[in-house]
A protein has these predicted regions:
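Short, charged helix-capping/linker segments at alpha-helix termini
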Residues: 2-10, 20-40, 51-53, 131, ...
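C-terminal flanking helix
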Residues: 16, 20, 42, 113, ...
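Structural recognition of an alpha-helix C-terminal capping motif at a helix-to-coil junction
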Residues: 36-43, 47, 56-68
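Hydrophobic positions on the alpha-helical face of helix-turn-helix-like DNA-binding modules
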Residues: 41, 65, 115-116, 128-129, ...
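Arg/Lys-rich amphipathic alpha helix in sigma70-family domain 2
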Residues: 51-53, 64-84
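DNA-recognition helix of helix-turn-helix
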Residues: 67, 71, 126, 132-156
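Acidic, proline/glycine-rich intrinsically disordered inter-domain spacer in sigma factors
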Residues: 81-106
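Short amphipathic alpha helix immediately N-terminal
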Residues: 107-131, 155-156
């Protein structure tokens, strides 16, 4: 795929909200803002766009690049990724159960956190498998297990 500025701008325009949401879901440090992370993801998308081979959907590929960039940044900085309440629609009222659930999701490990977040954003098992590099069966099993654990924690 030939990379040109127009193609890149159109791709970013189509997926900017998803990219922003992913960037916002990781707390890096006081030195890194969501905007900094967003720009880092854009650079990685630009660098990788020429190698995008269309075996996966564009949306899946962008999600994977953004997630991998954020995980790499998190490792470089030495902080754990943290899901913020803004990753999900804000409840119409302050609901402590909602925030408890967000904290429980935040406490999960990779790749389960990525699987849960991608599932919440409507990705199919096949798309999540491409994002994580796992098989569809592994995604299904890990999601089922993670959701079961979340239900158990929530009901305690």
């Amino acid at each position: 795929m030939e990379v040109d500025e127009r193609t890149f701008k159109e791709l970013i325009h189509r997926h900017r909200d998803m990219i922003w949401s992913i960037c916002k879901s990781y707390r890096l440090s006081a030195a890194w803002t969501t905007e900094d992370a967003f720009h880092e993801v854009l650079c990685d998308i630009w660098r990788g766009l020429g190698s995008f081979d269309k075996r996966s959907s564009e949306r899946t590929w962008v999600y994977r690049v953004a997630t991998n960039t954020m995980i790499t940044l998190t490792r470089k900085i030495g902080n754990q990724p943290t899901m913020e309440a803004t990753d999900y629609p804000e409840p119409s009222y302050r609901d402590d159960d909602y925030y408890d659930l967000v904290e429980m999701i935040e406490a999960t490990t990779e790749p389960d956190r990525t699987i849960i977040k991608a599932h919440a954003q409507g990705f199919s098992y096949a798309e999540i498998a491409k994002i994580t590099g796992l098989t569809v069966g592994a995604v299904s099993m890990r999601l089922t297990r993670a959701l079961r654990q979340l239900r158990k924690q929530y009901n305690q």
